[in-house]
Amino acid sequence: MENDKTVQGANQSANMYSYQEDQDQKYQFAQTGAIRRSLGEGNPSAFPENQINNISSMNNERAVGQNSIIIHIDQTPPLYWMFFVIFGIFQVIFIILLGCYYSKDNLINLELDDENGEDINKNGARDEITKNYKIFQEINVMIFLGFGFLRSFLKHHSWTSIAITLMGGIVAFEFGLFTLICWGAIFKRDWNNGIFNFQHFLDANYCAATIVISLGAVLGKLSLPQYLVMIFLETIFSTLNYVLLRQTMKIIDVGGALTVHLFGSIFGGMFSLVSSIMKNERERIRNSPHLGSNYNSNIFALFGTLLLITYFPSFNVSLIKDYSDKFKGVINTYLAILGSIVGSFCFSPFFNKGKIRIKDILNSCFSGGIIVAGSCHIINQLWASIILGVGSAEITTFLCNILSDKLKVYGYHDTSDIIYYHGIPGFLGGIVTTIFVGNLLQDKNETERNNFTDKNVYDYIGTIMNYTFEYNNNTFNSTDLSKYAGIHFSAIFITLAIAIASGFFAGFLIKFCNCNFAIRYFNDSEYFDVTNNESFPWDDELIDVQSNSRIGNGEKN
């Protein structure tokens, strides 16, 4: 049996192998490690044994035809070295910017106590640590541990999911520190004032959370350079949206229902849709044997959900300065999460023949924290928080079970279903905040309400948001508050517009540049050395050379 194949770069260290069929079709696969190759019932003599690390042939049961091969990659393709170079260069640039922008004079308010144990500055390090460090620490647990373990649900992609989440959070945090400064300067809001404190870290953490959420849509489908490009571009646009809404429009969104959850999910979903290449590539994604979870991976993901449930109140109230409002925000967030947990367990069996689907529990249980993220500190009826939590869980569970499979038919694939579990609650959270803005004055007595001016209203809102407003000294009336509620409502669609446009741009850029996508989707062996890991479930993907598509896998796991 002759198959008239030619091999270019035949030595073991070659970076690329090229297969040429009788039909003069060429298919190239990035390669630095071992290849398993089989030609029907034939022998692998087309590749000299001393040039291939590991060669095996298929038996008759696994044979699909004489034009089929199995590609098995053990090591990272050389293209990914570009990622490590870019990553290192970025870190050097960050160090230079940090050294140029922040000097000892900028850090004066962070000096420690003197030798007598007295605080040198009135608002020094002691106050910073007491007020903010605990919440800052809890937010980091939520972002890196909570979302990290939550994204480990893919059975053969857990290592990479956690690593990409960690990398995305770190890059977005560092880059976000300076993009926030740049956008603030463009909008003429000098929010930094040359002083470095925990507030800047908290703002950058919100940026990191946005990027981590977006990465959930494309986990397992991109190469490392593509992940890095996506993170850089989204950081620029997410901080633009953050500064525009919170510092220019002055909306109330302390927990990031719009700036974090809605923006992150829409950007990630649009990026995933646009960056998907040809139809046969979408089929490869949907039919990949690695796409899915198993019992053990879901246990780790459930641990991530528990961490998110535990630390979600800290995330929602981190930007609130008034302690009474912060206390109210914690209570409302926690009650909403309790309601969403109940709603998830009660509603999931309706779509799964009376059985609870673990996917609904993993993601819907914290949807209550998202829907009240913007308004947790202005909700004065505790029962409303529980109702909102139950409703958010039911809506997200319903939409995910109904629409998920239907959207895949049209080419949309979302690895973590972030559109349903972050986007929908975030959108609803924006509407809920708009409604509760109309009740901002109910804590004031009748005399104060009758004598309100614009200054009083904006100062009251400013107390909640910890911002100082510009205002005109006109007599207050209900129309003014309605206008402010209208600004809140418009912020929802401004966020949608920026997220859709920027996600489309980033996805098109990846597609237009024709960057190499992941060779093996949803598989840790794409990036990690697993050759010595006997427990790793090798299941080589079968490729039909004539149709240039993957039609199965060698061994089911």
Regions found by a protein language model. Name each.
Residues 19-23, 542:
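Acidic, Ser/Thr-interspersed intrinsically disordered low-complexity regions
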Residues 35-39, 47-557:
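Hydrophobic alpha-helical transmembrane bundles of multi-pass membrane proteins
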